[in-house]
């Protein structure tokens, strides 16, 4: 008999350095008005040399563990969704496992670009639902600033660095992860990619690639058209799987790519402004981290209060997209803790 699953914790790991649009004006031809009007982004966090992918993931993990007030030693599985690991191996998940003190946890990384956290959540739910594991730590983390051309105003203005985490646990009562939905279309792989970072690089193993050869590349118009169709499709399909109506969803927590995509998708779903969870203005596009970071902040600011039906929906390179509808009932067991204090 399938076991129900619920989310019992959420956490964040955010770099300390804030880069505002005014800061970007100093070295590229842009302005705060130009960036904000097109993306909704006002500032983003950028990782220092010491703030690695694993370091941010560890911060998010510890924050989620504190939220749920569980012992790290009780975690059975750690899944890290990232496109920007510290190294090809060992996995970031193994580094997290050692740092938080979870010696019995299995650990692996998963790569599905900005949709990675949704894929990881779905995989974690399957392990819990099958009875294989009871407690699963899922982390989305990316440091895209290492792969940006800081002279290209079409890409460098969009991204920030960060990590967000969820803790799933077997549910004694009803299943609170109501449905998940995953999709991919590899014919669009060329629309958003970071080249020359793997074995396809012609001189892999002999000559390191030049920095210019491994910058993130994106067809912004094509990604916009893809996203504004993919998000409503995923939300409707996931709601149907969950046996609810779109109108029954209390909050939409979308991938924080940019404000235009979020607003266009919300309009197609006939959702009100107050139903949309967004922090893209403060953190930019943090890739696999953006959904848990947005929900984490909305909970801290009391926009989302339990119980609430939330639809988490992501899209990104691959192309990949997907959604999860969850009933959020967890409360921060630290009381009125503020992670920014």
Residue ranges of predicted features:
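Condensing-enzyme catalytic core mediating Claisen C-C bond formation in acyl metabolism
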Residues: 1-49, 152-225, 229, 233, ...
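Flexible, glycine-rich active-site loops centered on histidine and acidic residues
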Residues: 129-163
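Phosphate/pyrophosphate-binding loops at sites that engage ATP/ADP/AMP, CoA/4′-phosphopantetheine
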Residues: 60-76, 233-250, 298-303
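Short beta-strand segments
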Residues: 8-11, 81, 111, 136-142, ...
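Active-site pocket-lining segment
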Residues: 214, 227-232, 246-269
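Buried hydrophobic positions in well-ordered alpha/beta secondary-structure cores of metabolic enzymes
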Residues: 7-9, 35, 64, 78, ...
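Catalytic phosphate/nucleotide-handling subdomain of diverse soluble enzymes
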Residues: 293-313, 319-339
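Conserved catalytic cysteine-centered active-site region
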Residues: 34-55, 82-136, 141, 266-295
């Amino acid at each position: 008999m399938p076991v129900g699953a619920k989310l019992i914790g959420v956490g964040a790991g955010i770099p300390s350095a804030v880069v505002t649009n005014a800061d970007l004006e100093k070295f590229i031809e842009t302005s705060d008005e130009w960036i904000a009007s097109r993306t909704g982004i006002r500032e983003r966090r950028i990782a220092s040399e010491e703030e690695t992918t694993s370091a941010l993931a560890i911060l998010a993990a510890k924050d989620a563990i504190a939220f749920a007030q569980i012992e790290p030693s009780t975690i059975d599985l750690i899944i890290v969704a990232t496109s920007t690991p510290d190294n090809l191996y060992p996995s970031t998940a193994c580094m997290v496992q050692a740092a938080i003190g979870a010696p019995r946890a299995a650990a692996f990384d998963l790569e599905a670009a900005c949709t990675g956290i949704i894929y990881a959540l779905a995989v974690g739910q399957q392990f819990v639902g099958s009875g294989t594991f009871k407690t699963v730590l899922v982390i989305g983390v990316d440091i895209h600033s290492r792969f940006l051309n800081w002279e290209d105003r079409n890409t460098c203005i969009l991204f920030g660095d960060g990590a967000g985490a969820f803790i799933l646990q077997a549910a004694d009562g009803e299943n609170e992860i109501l449905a998940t939905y995953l999709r991919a279309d590899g014919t669009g792989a060329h629309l958003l990619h970071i080249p020359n970072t793997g074995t396809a690089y012609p001189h892999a193993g002999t000559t390191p690639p030049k920095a210019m050869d491994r910058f993130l590349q994106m067809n912004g118009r094509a990604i916009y058209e893809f996203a504004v169709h993919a998000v409503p499709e995923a939300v409707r399909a996931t709601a149907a799987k969950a046996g609810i109506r779109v109108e029954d969803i209390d909050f939409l927590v979308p991938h924080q790519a940019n404000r235009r995509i979020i607003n266009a998708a919300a309009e197609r779903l006939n959702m009100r402004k107050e139903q949309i969870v967004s922090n893209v203005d403060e953190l930019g596009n943090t890739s696999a981290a953006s959904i848990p970071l947005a929900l984490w902040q909305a909970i801290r600011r009391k926009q989302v209060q339990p119980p609430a039906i939330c639809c988490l929906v992501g899209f990104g390179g691959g192309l990949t997209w997907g959604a999860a509808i969850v009933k959020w009932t967890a409360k921060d067991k630290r009381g009125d803790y503020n992670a920014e204090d």
